[in-house]
């Protein structure tokens, strides 16, 4: 049991070190030797868990997917309105990126052309599905104008979430993501939400930003 626990801890250490390097330097610019040095483990320990760098990348994207689904599931369990669930989801994903390198590295790997192994969905496809379902629900609940093109808005929202992180990677720290997410919603709420319902969701976005900043 103790040996198994140490092995799991070593695996986690290696994944975290790899995620940090992939996030900061990219997949192609990071070698297994770099990861070994950053994780402070032996090459034998690394190869015990991962036969190749691609296996590490896949493990990171798998963890990112699990975290995103967990955040979405926890929000769904609250039973809140669809638009509130969508806003909370985007801030939840921003928080994952602020708190650790796994989410940030997973995104960089996806935008860097690293292959996603089935049955794991591509991160952008998964995000599009999470967003589309909640947008559709918000239209039915009259929190979003009925004539909105849900597919177009969902695609634009995915591009915003991904693009903000890609651009911000070289321009500002990950801690800026909650602010950028709040700015996104200030624009979207004005364009999508009927006037009487806007104050509620503007207030929600501002509150979620404050909560993340206070927590980290």
Protein language model features and the residues they cover:
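Base-recognition residues in the alpha-helical recognition helix of bacterial helix-turn-helix
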Residues: 23, 47-51, 63
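Basic, helix-initiating cap at the start of DNA-binding domains
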Residues: 1-25, 29-41, 54-58, 67
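Hydrophobic alpha-helical connector segments
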Residues: 59, 66, 70-99, 103, ...
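Short secondary-structure transition hinges
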Residues: 91-144
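Key DNA-contact positions within bacterial/archaeal DNA-binding proteins
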Residues: 44
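Hydrophobic alpha-helical segments that form the core
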Residues: 92-94, 146-167, 176-191, 206-210
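C-terminal peripheral helix-coil segments that are non-catalytic and often amphipathic
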Residues: 125-129, 133-141, 171-216
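Conserved hydrophobic residue
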Residues: 28, 144-145
């Amino acid at each position: 049991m103790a040996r198994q626990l140490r092995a799991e801890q070593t695996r986690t250490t290696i994944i975290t070190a790899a995620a940090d390097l992939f996030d900061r330097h990219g997949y192609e610019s990071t070698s297994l030797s770099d990861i070994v040095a950053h994780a402070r483990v032996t090459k034998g320990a690394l190869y015990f868990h991962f036969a190749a760098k691609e296996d590490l990348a896949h493990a990171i994207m798998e963890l990112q997917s699990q975290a995103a689904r967990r955040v979405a599931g926890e929000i769904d369990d609250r039973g809140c309105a669809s638009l509130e669930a969508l806003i909370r989801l985007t801030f939840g994903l921003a928080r994952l990126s602020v708190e650790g390198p796994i989410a940030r590295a997973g995104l960089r790997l996806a935008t860097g052309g690293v292959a996603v192994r089935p049955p794991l969905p591509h991160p952008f496809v998964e995000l599009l599905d999470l967003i589309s379902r909640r947008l559709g629900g918000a239209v039915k609940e009259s929190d979003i104008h009925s004539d909105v093109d849900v597919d177009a808005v969902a695609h634009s929202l995915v591009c915003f979430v991904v693009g903000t992180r890609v651009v911000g990677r070289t321009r500002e720290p990950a801690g800026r993501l909650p602010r950028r997410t709040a700015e996104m919603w200030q624009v979207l709420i004005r364009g999508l939400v009927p006037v009487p319902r806007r104050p509620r969701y503007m207030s929600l976005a501002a509150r979620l930003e404050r909560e993340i900043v206070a927590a980290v």
